[in-house]
Regions:
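Catalytic cores and adjacent flexible loops of soluble metabolic enzymes
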Residues: 1-378
Length: 378
């Protein structure tokens, strides 16, 4: 039987806005308001052993650090999860789940390391955690590649596998195509998740489509308070929770979410606004990594038409894997072919010189009279 669930990832994805420095009081406020709102799953941040522990930040080197921040807070019936970007947190930094405040680990990974990442997920599962296999940049997968990943995931049998639209590229038809590939081929016990970004202003409508799609399994969507998140932002949780209350009979307390937004989120928005803008539209419309757009815009020498021309020349396999040297080469090539003035300069050298024009009575020795004489010529 289908179940629909809501996952909040404000303290993790929202951290891209403020380098995860929410401040301890805000961390507690956001956590407690979301628990009171009744969210099903709450993601409390990144586990990243390259970072040192800071109680004011939601990026932590170990699960024990997460325990220090959240351990005394009542999580009620909500599942508490953290995220690992595969390769940034060694398995030794995870305590057994039975000794941790955290219930589940979401592991994000790119296509080229999916075999290694799934093996890491097996190790996480052995520690007793609920595991979420998060396939980032889902649009980089062909159908065959995605089905190969599904085979690996079926063998893992995680709590969930998620479609991660990292750069907000998906429209309804291709989103549902990916969803159906998973729905028809994943074991029924594995939930399907969807993580959206708002580059095309489609996070809300796409999430509604995923929730409405027939499925005999659990389907969950990610959202954040006021859409706080990387680049164009995420699905606003206050919108999708209202929709889920109306259509699916859920009972999320939206007022608690609005309180958290007012108290803890709006100060960050006023300082560093997120949301749809032209920059993220250009990256999404060209199906490319936003750093390519940023690189070209920072040159301050190109029109939007020229930027689109260069982005269109990026090879498909390079589009979502940012390569600074590669885009520099494309930029220089464009400049040399489209903006090369050498031919025009040579043409000017070949032009017949214009005859020297001299006033009828010669050039005056007085400078002011000279200017006057020149004006008379025109």
């Amino acid at each position: 039987m289908k179940q629909v669930k809501l996952l909040d990832c404000t303290l993790r994805d929202g951290g891209y806005v403020n380098d995860w420095e929410f401040g301890h009081d805000n961390i507690v406020t956001i956590f407690e308001r979301l628990i009171s709102a009744g969210v099903d799953i709450l993601e409390v941040g990144f586990l990243d052993d390259r970072r040192t522990f800071d109680r004011n930040r939601t990026i932590m080197p170990t699960t024990q650090c997460a325990d220090q921040i959240f351990g005394k807070l009542d999580k009620g019936n909500t599942m508490i999860v953290a995220m690992i970007d595969y390769g940034t947190c060694d398995i030794s930094n995870l305590s057994p789940c039975s000794e941790s405040y955290i219930d589940g680990i979401r592991v994000i990974f790119k296509k080229h390391v999916m075999h290694e990442a799934i093996q890491f997920c097996h190790e996480v599962k052995k520690l007793g955690y609920k595991v979420f296999a998060q396939a980032v940049s889902i649009t980089s997968y062909s159908d065959r590649e995605l089905l190969d990943l599904v085979d690996l995931v079926n063998d893992l049998e995680p709590y969930a596998m998620s479609l991660v639209d990292t750069y907000g590229l998906l429209h309804q038809d291709n989103l549902l195509h990916y969803f159906q590939l998973l729905n028809y081929n994943l074991k029924p016990s594995i939930a399907i998740g969807y993580h959206s970004h708002n580059n095309f202003q489609l996070a809300y409508s796409n999430s509604m489509e995923v929730l409405r799609e027939p499925a005999d399994r659990t389907v969950l969507v990610d959202a954040t308070l006021y859409g706080m998140g990387k680049s164009a932002g995420n699905l606003p949780i206050e919108l999708i929770s209202m929709y889920m209350n109306t259509v699916f009979g859920r009972n999320f307390n939206v007022s608690q979410m609005l309180e958290a937004i007012d108290i803890s989120i709006m100060p960050f928005f006023r300082k560093s606004p997120w949301g749809y803008n032209l920059f993220f539209y250009i990256s999404a419309s060209n199906n490319c990594h936003p750093n390519y757009v940023r690189f070209l815009m920072d040159k301050h020498t190109l029109s939007l038409k020229s930027i689109n021309t260069i982005l269109d020349a990026i090879e498909p396999e390079k589009k979502l894997l940012y390569d600074k040297d590669y885009i520099e080469t494309l930029y220089r090539r464009y400049q040399s072919t489209e903006c090369n003035d050498e031919a025009d300069i040579q043409a000017l050298h070949l032009c017949t010189p214009m005859p020297r024009m001299v006033p009828p009575n010669g050039f005056p020795s007085d400078l002011h009279n000279y200017h006057a004489a020149v004006l008379l010529l025109y």
